[in-house]
């Protein structure tokens, strides 16, 4: 019986020929029937792939044969190839699009000048020692924090990683520059870069969590400082660290607790992801993001008795 798994991984290391790495990775994944998304740049590699567990193990072995990836850590998650529509392997200026390709410097040890790495237990120890002085700083898109975040975290008003530089240069967070700031994100990669960008802009004591939220949640479940669900970028949309998790998200229409993001019914112009409970999503009249144009489209569909989910 085939057992599916998902691999999450990244490595910051100098790549002199990203195009050659792209071709090799594509051929390797195709030969192992893996699907997912891999980004490659001169700074390294960032990937999420899924497939049969034995094929995933073979992928790890083969990928680690490349000298720059020999020590790369792979995180396992539930799922499989079916959680991804296809295989995508691309070369980009950055493996995370902060819009600062020339600011980031890497060597064989990773990003130069990033925040101090903390293991999950060291995060708790820092909070025990420094108390309320410690600030958790969300390194994800603001939307992701709607369903889960570290307790009392600062959540920057950003829609994409491209927004972060403008946000941290805005002056909103200048009062944090002398405080211990723990940046966090899903698997750690965004904070490798964000922590470096913050240090370059005057933040004096910046940390990042080894393995990100995923590793922290694996260690402490719902008994630590993390609250709620974790947004993930595949068909699952979210994951939890046990059954007794706190539900932070609420339906935008009826305020029912939910951790499920759904697309707005306005497929041509919007498709925004918003939190909707099953009942409101099932009703085409409330299957919208709340914007005036989308409300009108949903009302028109309902009046005509048309439900795109039924007619697809």
UniProtKB/Swiss-Prot annotation:
This is tRNA uridine(34) hydroxylase. InterPro entries: Rhodanese-like_dom, Rhodanese-like_dom_sf, Rhodanese_C, TrhO, TRHO_N. The keyword rRNA-binding does not apply. It comes from the Bacteria. It holds the Pfam family Rhodanese_C. Belongs to the TrhO family. Keywords: Oxidoreductase, tRNA processing. Residues 130-225 form the Rhodanese domain. The gene is trhO. One of its GO terms (molecular function) is oxidoreductase activity, acting on paired donors, with incorporation or reduction of molecular oxygen. Catalyzes oxygen-dependent 5-hydroxyuridine (ho5U) modification at position 34 in tRNAs. The active site is at residue 185. GO terms for biological process: tRNA modification. PROSITE patterns: RHODANESE_3. Its EC number is 1.14.-.-. It catalyses: uridine(34) in tRNA + AH2 + O2 = 5-hydroxyuridine(34) in tRNA + A + H2O. The keyword S-adenosyl-L-methionine does not apply.
């Amino acid at each position: 019986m085939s057992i599916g798994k998902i691999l999450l991984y990244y490595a910051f290391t100098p790549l002199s020929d990203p195009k050659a790495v792209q071709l090799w990775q594509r051929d390797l994944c195709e030969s192992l029937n893996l699907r997912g998304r891999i980004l490659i740049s001169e700074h390294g590699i960032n990937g999420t792939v899924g497939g049969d567990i034995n094929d995933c193990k073979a992928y790890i072995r083969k990928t680690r044969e490349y000298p720059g990836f020999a020590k790369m850590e792979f995180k396992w998650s539930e799922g499989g190839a079916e959680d991804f529509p296809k295989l995508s392997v691309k070369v980009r200026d950055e493996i995370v699009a902060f819009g600062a390709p020339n600011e980031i410097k890497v060597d064989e040890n990773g990003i130069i000048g990033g925040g101090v790495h903390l293991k999950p237990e060291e995060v708790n120890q820092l909070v025990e020692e420094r108390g309320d002085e410690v600030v958790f700083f969300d390194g994800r898109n603001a939307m992701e924090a709607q369903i889960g975040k570290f307790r009392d975290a600062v959540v920057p008003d950003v829609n994409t990683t491209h927004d972060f530089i403008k946000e941290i240069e805005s002056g909103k967070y200048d009062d944090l520059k002398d405080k211990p700031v723990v940046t966090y994100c899903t698997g750690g990669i965004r904070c490798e870069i964000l922590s470096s960008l913050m240090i370059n802009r005057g933040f004096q004591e910046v940390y990042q969590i080894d393995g990100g939220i995923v590793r922290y949640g694996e260690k402490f479940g719902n008994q630590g400082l993390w609250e709620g669900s974790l947004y993930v970028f595949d068909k699952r949309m979210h994951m939890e660290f046990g059954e007794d998790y706190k539900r932070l998200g609420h339906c935008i229409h009826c305020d029912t607790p939910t951790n499920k993001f759904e697309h707005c019914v306005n497929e041509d112009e919007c498709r925004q992801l918003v939190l909707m409970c099953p009942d409101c999503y099932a009703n085409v009249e409330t299957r919208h993001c709340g914007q005036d144009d989308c409300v009108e489209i949903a009302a028109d569909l309902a009046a005509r008795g048309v439900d795109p989910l039924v007619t697809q």
